[in-house]
From Swiss-Prot:
Bias (Polar residues): 434-443, 559-577
Self-association and partners: Interacts with CDC27 and maybe other components of the APC/C complex. Interacts with histone variant H2AX under DNA damage conditions.
UniProt KW Nucleotide-binding keyword: no
Biased composition, class Basic residues, residue ranges: 343-361
GO biological-process terms attached to the record: bone development; cerebral cortex development; establishment of mitotic spindle orientation; mitotic cell cycle; negative regulation of transcription by RNA polymerase II; neuronal stem cell population maintenance; protein localization to centrosome; regulation of centrosome cycle
Summary of the tissues where the protein is detected: Expressed in fetal brain, liver and kidney.
Full protein name: Microcephalin
Subcellular location(s) per record: Cytoplasm, Cytoskeleton, Microtubule organizing center, Centrosome
Keyword Translocase carried by entry: no
Length: 835
């Protein structure tokens, strides 16, 4: 750690890139801490210095208002290199956006990932305060409980218990107490497993349908606060007269207006069976609020259809409207309303499973009906919905059911109660086993022509169809490109399967191309396309080609690269024939017309196999014309040079990791360079953190590179672009650097120095340091000749243990290094190795 030269400094760091997407504050914060400064995370009154670059305007204004010293990042670097507290006035900060309008200034969004620290009460003060507040609130609730609030506690094993402090007057609470006590006695879980449900159904099959563990009195359900204006009217007034059809149509149209689902929830669907229908006496006074709350809770269970897919809001809305239409047709029939006792048996099979199946297949209703029916308000809809539904439930109750209902009904009946076991079991059955239930609904009475038309308009026949179909190859290829927006059953399906870049689809196209080659006349050939990768029940689902244009482009790019890679491996005609049969033919033809270089590079067997197909070429003329537009952007991208990596490389040497991180971030920001670990042919700049003679510095000098200090990067970061290198060149420490750079700039071809051009052949000892390869490279770059054997050399570099000759000079490695550094051949007498 450096000396605490900035021990009296309290700094606030705000260093951003010029476009506001990169935050470099962390690196300079580390440097300040190493120098003994205290870094504040917030701009408080203790801050004495603000390290500022392209920061927020508010920070700049606050610093100027308080008189805090505003310095640039160069001040931090100068203090670190000098090892002393430098005067701040020498490195003032600049605010480039000070005079810009607030409309022009961009919002900042740092693209760097943040360090995620899990918040706990120990490391987060706000979380600790919230935790303490919750603990105090819980303690207050335990000590100061209201008289009418029951206590729900959990035992150590997790079971729910009920511990009332005083007697509760409300019947609602007493009913809940009975229910919880009953659950505790029976050891009944809130959410029993499937094995528990099956065990309950086997233990008590006779009482599973009419079990009513709790009896709620009429007074509890009929409190005055739950009544709305029109709820006292009887069911006959609402749904039994001739005006019921108009009301139902208003109700159905209002569903779209208020965007609420009328899917029958499992709680409401239970009423369609015998066990949970309310009595005739109390139905017109049942609570609408409770009904609606139960409906909203249980709608969640119906948002997934039986196949496990999530139903979108549009599908739910349309499904609810189609379901409402079915119920309206059956309920509004004069025969049905007048002879309830006779027709109840036929409408019994309309169970929850059938209704849910219908929800999953619902489709959108005609838009004309939507416009006509947007009239009712939210207040008038839901009570009517409840009452009409309740009247529909009444029609499903037979004579024996009324006797069973006289024992009472539980208002806390939940989905996991044993009463609903039969219904839940029917939901879990596969869709095929539930399909035979739906024709029972249509057998209630004959439908009129208008009703049949509306049912067919709302039905989805996409699942009815053949699993294989015949497509003509002419239509298949021509409509692939010429009519991309047409999504017919045959052509659209074939197009989507050929354009997709998935491997299975590509193999399918290969098989199609192979079949076409086998026939003598390709234009009139008709064959069957099979879709093995598609799931059953979705054979005729069509994919619009508008959404797959990107996939078409990717397919073109992918196949063109595959052609380049695969054609180079083909050596004879038979292999070329096999290759052409295993890829989509229209891609091959397009590539042949796109690049003349690829035509020349193709082997004879491959090009012959393409040319010998006149039928295919005729068929696919339109395909190539369509794909030319897709290939043009790729060619333009190549011509413009975008997307390529930078050809210049930058090498760092004698630089600590924190400086390297800054350089990497600046290079990523300003572009134009890629970073290399060692000097190579593409290296143009060598950055040296300290003026030390390293191998990378010597190689950079020998190759004519810029040898620069670290300040060049900082000033480039300050100004937002790469600046001139000359003021930052380390020519004082390495005099040869500017000379070699000038020679490299003036040379016409590849640069090679002339320093050792007049010297005899040299042999580099294997025991030399630096390594042999690097020394040989240095000698070669400076124009010298390196011999592989010592007997052919007049100069031996490095320690040599063999037999020595009097005519050979045995020199130290430093002779080469010093000569390159000073750009002159040093006197060999000063570097002779001892005999």
């Amino acid at each position: 750690m450096a000396a605490p030269i900035l021990k009296d400094v309290v700094a606030y760091v705000e260093v951003w890139s010029s476009n506001g997407t990169e935050n470099y504050s962390k690196t300079f914060t580390t440097q300040l801490v190493d120098m003994g400064a205290k870094v504040s995370k917030t701009f408080n009154k203790q801050v004495t210095h603000v390290i500022f670059k392209d920061g927020y305007q508010s920070t700049w204004d606050k610093a100027q208002k308080r008189g805090v010293k505003l310095v640039s990042v160069l001040w931090v670097e100068k203090c670190r290199t000098a090892g002393a507290h430098i005067d701040e006035s020498l490195f003032p900060a600049a605010n480039m956006n000070e005079h810009l309008s607030s409309l022009i200034k961009k919002k900042r969004k740092c693209m760097q990932p943040k360090d995620f620290n899990f918040k706990t009460p120990e490391n987060d003060k706000r979380f600790q305060k919230k935790f303490e507040k919750m603990a105090k609130e819980l303690q207050r609730q335990k000590t100061n409980l209201d008289d009418d609030v029951p206590i729900l506690l959990f035992e150590s094993n997790g079971s729910l218990i009920y511990t009332p402090t005083i007697e509760i007057n409300s019947r609602h609470h007493s009913a809940m107490e009975k229910r919880l006590q009953e659950m505790k006695e029976k050891r009944e879980n809130l959410s029993p497993t499937s094995s528990q449900m099956i065990q309950q159904s086997h233990d008590n099959p006779s009482n599973s349908l009419c079990e009513a563990p709790l009896n709620i009195s009429r007074d509890t359900l009929c409190s005055d606060e739950y009544f709305a204006g029109g709820l006292h009217s009887s069911f006959d007034d609402l749904c039994g007269n001739s005006g019921c059809g108009n009301q139902e149509r208003k109700l159905e149209g209002s569903i779209n207006d208020i965007k609420s689902d009328v899917c029958i929830s499992s709680l409401v669907l239970k009423a369609n069976n015998i066990h949970s229908s309310p009595s005739f006496t109390h139905l017109d006074k049942s609570s609408p609020q409770k009904f609606l709350s139960n409906l909203s809770k249980e709608e969640i269970n119906l948002q997934r259809n039986i196949a496990g897919k999530v139903v979108t809001p549009d599908q739910k809305q349309a499904a609810g409207m189609s379901q409402e239409t079915f119920e309206e047709k059956y309920r509004l029939s004069p025969t049905l309303s007048s002879t309830k006792g006779h027709l109840l048996i036929h409408s019994r099979p309309r169970s929850s499973s059938v209704k849910r199946k219908r929800v999953s297949h619902g489709s959108h209703s005609p838009p004309k009906e939507k416009c006509k029916r947007k009239r009712s308000t939210r207040r008038s809809i839901m009570p009517r919905l409840q009452l009409c539904r309740s009247e529909d439930r009444l029609q499903h109750v037979a004579g024996p059911a009324l006797e069973a209902l006289s024992c009472g009904e539980s208002s806390y009946d939940d989905y996991f109660s044993p009463d609903n076991l039969k219904e839940r079991y029917s939901e879990n059955l596969p869709p095929e086993s539930q399909l035979p239930s739906s024709p029972a609904q249509l057998s209630c009475r004959s439908l009129s022509k208008k009703e049949r038309t509306s049912i067919f308009e709302m039905s989805d026949f996409s699942c009815v169809g053949k699993k294989t179909r015949t497509v003509d190859i002419t239509n298949f290829t021509a409509k692939t490109i010429s009519s991309p927006r047409k999504t017919g059953n045959g052509e659209g399906r074939a197009t989507s399967s050929c354009v997709t870049s998935a491997p299975e689809e590509a193999l399918r196209c290969c098989r199609q191309a192979g079949k076409e080659d086998a026939c003598p006349e390709g234009n009139g050939f008709s064959y069957t396309i099979e879709d093995p990768a598609l799931p059953k029940g979705h054979d005729d689902d069509l994919t619009p080609l508008e959404g797959s244009l990107e996939e078409m482009k990717e397919a073109v790019g992918l196949k063109s690269t595959q052609n380049k890679g695969t054609t180079s491996k083909i050596s004879n005609s038979s292999e070329g024939e096999a290759q052409s049969e295993h890829e989509p033919c229209f891609i091959v033809d397009c590539n042949m017309e796109t690049s003349t270089e690829e035509k020349e590079n193709l082997p004879g067997g491959y090009s012959g196999s393409v040319k010998n197909r006149p039928t295919r070429h005729d068929v696919l003329d339109d395909s190539c014309d369509g794909f030319k537009d897709l290939i043009k952007p790729h060619e333009e991208l190549k011509k413009s040079g975008r997307g390529k990596k930078p050809t210049r490389t930058l090498v760092m040497t004698s630089m600590p990791s924190e400086k390297q991180n800054v350089v990497i971030q600046v290079v990523d920001k300003l572009k134009g360079f890629s970073i290399a670990p060692d000097v190579c042919e593409t290296t143009t700049h060598v950055l040296s953190g300290k003026p030390l003679r390293t191998l990378n510095v010597l190689l950079g000098i020998a190759r004519g590179c810029w040898v620069l200090s670290y300040d060049w990067v900082l000033w480039s970061l300050e100004l937002g672009h790469w600046i001139s290198e000359e003021p930052f060149e380390l020519s004082h420490h390495f005099p040869a650097a500017p000379l070699c750079r000038s020679e490299c700039h003036l040379s016409a071809g590849p640069y090679r120095g002339t320093l050792f051009a007049d010297q005899p052949a040299m042999f580099v000892s294997p025991a030399s340091s630096p390594p042999v390869a690097k020394l040989c490279e240095l000698v070669h770059l400076c124009g010298g000749r390196v011999s592989q054997v010592p007997r052919q050399a007049s100069i031996v570099i490095g320690p040599y243990s063999g037999k020595k000759k009097a005519t050979v000079k045995y020199l130290s490695e430093k002779w080469v290094l010093d000569s390159i550094t000073q750009h002159k051949v040093c006197a060999p007498e000063n570097y002779l190795l001892s005999q």
